[in-house]
Each structure stands twice: as structure tokens, then as C-alpha cells.
A protein has these predicted regions:
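Conserved N-terminal phosphate-binding loop of PLP-dependent enzymes in the Aspartate aminotransferase
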Residues: 1-296
């Protein structure tokens, strides 16, 4: 089916003149003559600049868990906008939200707020390094943790042919501009491979600060952990003094109210949150055990 682009195309042509590929993320570019220009959204629907109506299955790549322009969210956000937006100081609203997260998420003791999922995973890794006085970390192939340099390896968009073998995986850099030396700090392993994780930690635990994992892979049609895999990670991290980080940017407040922690019954040392936390408002958080978080 072909839709009118009488209004959308001129807008996107202007975007191409002043924005790289006319978008704010490469994932949004669908071609010079087919990238949508959205005018509004309500509930599960969006409308483009020409008034064409669509069912929105992307929902902002995950954040819009309550639907676009939810009346309850819009009302509360509008109320707080009238009082100011950024004070560089503690507000009662922060405290209220933090208390709710601590109450909802099993094992959550203390947290910090930030703006994006990228920042949340970046802070979580830095906290783990500070707590353990070690520098390297493990991530899993196909998993996405944002766009800071340390996690831009072996994501779902990486060519499988470049990743090496199952027994000798190779971190595959995503995009350009990442210093070559950073690769030395990352171990990329196959997800759900019990033996690979155990061998890596046994051989390199003296230099590994953290194990960063999406409990359920969001960018690859929702691949779940095999029975016992997350518990296996917990046991190994305890044994080798490694901080277990759940990246719950996608799973948080979605798999269940308490996220993957509640759904799978495994408590990490730190979890990261964004997306569903704000229903499209840029807010994120990372938190976990007080002993670990207090090193910040």
C-alpha cells in the first residue's frame, strides 16, 4: 500500500539538509523517500505529517509502555513543568520515585537517577570497577547496552562471520571512532553458554570487574535465558568477586513489576533502567546493593 507523502517528503528533505541522514539515530533511517515523519501519537497509534494513521508496534523502541500521550502521564508531567525542571538539588519527587522503585524491585536498596539507558550502563560499569578495583568486564553476543565505547561490541547488528568461533569468540566493534585499546577490556561470550562463562571467569577473574547481561535479549526477538543460566551467573560472580549487572533498560517494569529480578528470581548487584521507567520521558536509573552503590 502506498501512502501520500505530500507533506512528509518536503519536511524530510529539509531534515536531510541539516541532520545526518535526516534522523537522530541510524536505526530510524528507512530511505530518502520512505522514512516516516511523525506528527502525533495517541495510545497505540501514530499519525504522520500527511495524516496517515498507523498502529505503532515500535512504541519508541520500547519506552511507550502505556501508549502515546497517556492522559495520566501528561497531566502529571504538565504539573511539574510549571514548577521548573532542573535545580541541581534534591527534590521530593526524586525521593518519591526512588522509594517506589525500591519497593517494587526485589533486592533494590539504593539507586541513582540519570537521563538515558546508555548513561545508566556506563555508570553501572564504572561503579563495578570502583567496587572491585578491577577493569575488564564480560558482555554477551547480540546484546545491546547503549552507545558508549565500552559496550559497542558484538551487538545484534554485528556480522556473525566476524565473531570467531563459539569457543574463541572475538569482540566485533560496532561503527567507527572507538579506540582499539578498548577492545582489550571486553570479553564477549555466547549467551546461554554455561561453560564459556565459567571458563572465562576461572581464567581471568583477577581482572574482571563486572558481568553485564540483558536477562532477556530485547533486540533479538526476546531470547530468554535457559533454566538456571542467570542463577549460574550469580553463583560464579559470588565465587570470583565479580559484580553482576542486569541491564533492565528493556525488561524493567515490563516482564513484571519488579522486572527480570522478579520474573527469574535472581538478584544482581546492580540493575539499570530506562525506557518503561519514563513512558517516553528521558529518565533512567541504576541501583542495587548499598554496599556496591555506596562506592560512588
Amino acid at each position: 500500500m502506498k501512502f501520500s507523502r505530500e507533506k512528509s517528503q518536503p519536511i524530510f528533505d529539509r531534515a536531510m539538509n541539516v541532520m545526518v541522514k535526516g534522523v537522530s539515530s541510524n536505526f530510524r533511517f528507512l530511505g530518502k523517500n520512505s522514512t516516516p515523519v511523525i506528527a502525533k501519537g495517541k495510545g497505540a497509534h501514530i499519525w504522520d505529517a500527511d495524516g496517515n494513521k498507523f498502529i505503532d508496534y515500535r512504541l519508541g523502541w520500547g519506552p511507550i509502555i502505556l501508549g502515546h500521550a497517556d492522559d495520566r502521564v501528561s497531566k502529571e508531567v504538565s504539573k511539574y513543568l510549571e514548577n521548573g525542571t532542573s535545580f541541581a538539588a534534591t527534590t521530593e519527587l526524586e525521593v518519591i520515585v526512588a522509594e517506589k522503585i525500591v519497593a517494587m524491585v526485589p533486592g533494590m536498596e539504593k539507586l541513582r537517577f540519570t537521563n538515558t539507558g546508555t548513561e545508566a550502563t556506563m555508570h553501572a560499569l564504572r561503579t563495578a570497577r570502583g567496587y572491585t578495583n578491577k577493569e575488564k568486564f564480560i558482555k554477551f553476543e547480540g546484546q545491546y547496552h547503549g552507545v558508549h565505547d565500552y559496550v559497542m561490541f558484538s551487538t545484534a547488528s554485528s556480522p556473525i562471520s566476524a565473531m570467531g568461533s563459539k569457543t574463541s569468540p572475538i569482540p566485533v566493534q560496532v561503527g567507527s571512532g572507538i579506540p582499539n585499546k578498548i577492545r582489550e577490556y571486553v570479553y564477549c561470550l555466547p549467551f546461554n553458554d554455561f561453560n564459556a562463562v565459567e571458563k572465562c571467569l576461572k581464567d581471568h577473574h583477577g581482572e574482571i570487574a563486572a558481568l553485564l547481561v540483558e536477562p532477556c535479549l530485547g533486540n533479538i526477538v526476546g531470547i530468554e535465558p535457559q533454566d538456571g543460566f542467570l542463577g549460574h551467573l550469580r553463583t560464579l560472580c559470588d565465587k570470583y568477586n565479580v559484580v553482576l549487572i542486569f541491564d533492565e533498560v528493556k525488561t524493567g517494569f515490563r516482564l513484571s513489576n519488579g522486572g527480570a529480578r522478579e520474573t527469574y528470581g535472581v538478584i544482581p548487584d546492580i540493575s539499570t533502567y530506562a525506557k518503561s521507567l519514563g513512558n517516553g520521558i528521558p529518565v533512567a536509573a541504576f541501583g542495587g546493593k548499598s554496599e556496591v552503590m555506596n562506592v560512588i
